[in-house]
Amino acid sequence: SISETALRVFQTEELRWVATDQGVLEHSCALGGQDPAPARHFQPWRWGGEGAPAVFFRDTGLSDAVGFRYQERDPVAAMDELIGHLETIRRGLPEEGEFLVPLILDGENAWEAYPGSGEAFLREFYGRIAAHPNLHWSTFSDHLDRGGSLGMLTHVRAGSWIRADFTTWMGHPQKTRGWELLAAARDDFQAALEAGGALRKVTLADGRTVPAPDPDVVGPGRPGDLARAMAAMADAESSDWFWWYGDDNPTEYGREFDDLFRGHLRNAAALAGLTPRPETASPVPHDGGRS
């Protein structure tokens, strides 16, 4: 997922590149009134000026074919299809210039669904690309090293590489309830940090100054409690807990994911010297499995 706010943070942290879905590029160009030529779908872009990270937008169809379809195909037949698509793309591009087709798999591990953990497919993939006269494989860093051109975005429409939006993580009443629990716990946590003098000022790449926890400040209780509290809050904020709420991603482990999420909220509060909110002790009902 990316947004203009996230890209500012990435620039501050000096990330060289990030990646997301081509749908985010299409929405961003529409938002900014830009109409890129088809060739510009196969190059990185930048938003935010010099020093901002390059953004690569994956080819959704081909990436999902590798991630979700080709495990059911003979590796040779699958690569025949993939090479055919890549050759078609290449014929539609100018002769001169550096272009690439980003193949970025979904977050799940695709290879466990392939026979032999994907070894036969990967050998076919790298062998066929290496032997092809007009195609070669590359990392994103290598592509940038070769000096390929970057498109400049005037706006970035916030979105993920799943449908180019955030509906997987928000919108359902149970997902909303999870966000409410997180927001309340985060507000309590930040108030405790402010009261304890545990916030420092951090300047972002665009010049804005924002508060951030200072891990060198000793929290309440044992030395290191504040660092552990920060880690617990980060665990609650940083994973796909909301993916599993609602009815769009069924799982038999809904109760376990819910317990883990609320456990991180309670741990963060306790380690920061707070009494965990009582509502974090009650399960969030889960449509996709046991509740």
Regions found by a protein language model. Give the residues of each.
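Acidic-and-aromatic substrate-binding clefts and catalytic sites of carbohydrate-active enzymes
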Residues: S1-E4, L25-Q34, W111-E112, D145-R146
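Contiguous, well-ordered alpha-helical segments that form the cores/surfaces of helical PPI scaffolds
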Residues: E4-T5, A231
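Acidic, His- and aromatic-enriched active-site or binding-groove loops in soluble protein domains
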Residues: L7-G49
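Active-site and substrate-binding clefts of carbohydrate-active enzymes
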Residues: D35-A65, Y70-S291
